[in-house]
Amino acid sequence: MEDKKSRPGPRPGGRSALVQAAVHRAVRDIQAQGDAQQLTIPAIAEKAGVTPSTIYRRWGTLAELLSDVAVENLRPDHEPEDCGNFRADLLAWIEQYIEEISSVPGRNMLRTVLAVDKPQNRVQCTTYTLEQVEVIRQRALARGEAVPAGDAILDRLVAPLIYRLLFASEQPDRARIETLVDALLVDG
């Protein structure tokens, strides 16, 4: 009998990762068709080539699965643009971030992540944002610029803009964004 301790853990890119990728792809495909009635676990399972029980076992509910897919879709696909100085880098990044998040799909993804009691998904969204902010900060520090902490950028720039998007349904304009960035740079 094989000792459980000697068995390797899940392989990165193994069967579990392939199942997750297939299920996520099936969700995105069905969402792209625009028919919310078709977004069911049996339909997703059929499209992904897995059984519904596989989805229930891994995600539990449709809402949790949709939250996982939303988190994956919120992952940035490239580093922030390097514009030559911290202020310009931060402005370029936050404007693009807000443009993406304020789109109908972006708002829907945020609401989906927030609707499910799955704190690790919200933490992952924060991690993605902090990683982007940290790239900008490290570039600026390498240029010898003084920069605020990453948490200060989240609290004083990102959070107020996200709040307005979600609760005031307000698309922040460039003037508001610049005001927040400049206040952050003055007060650190």
Write out the residue ranges for each language-model feature.
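Hydrophobic/aromatic-rich alpha-helical bundle segments in the mid-to-C-terminal region
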Residues: 126-130, 140-184
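Short, basic, alpha-helical segments at the C-terminal edge of helix-turn-helix-like DNA-binding modules
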Residues: 41, 70-77
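Basic, helix-initiating cap at the start of DNA-binding domains
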Residues: 1-47
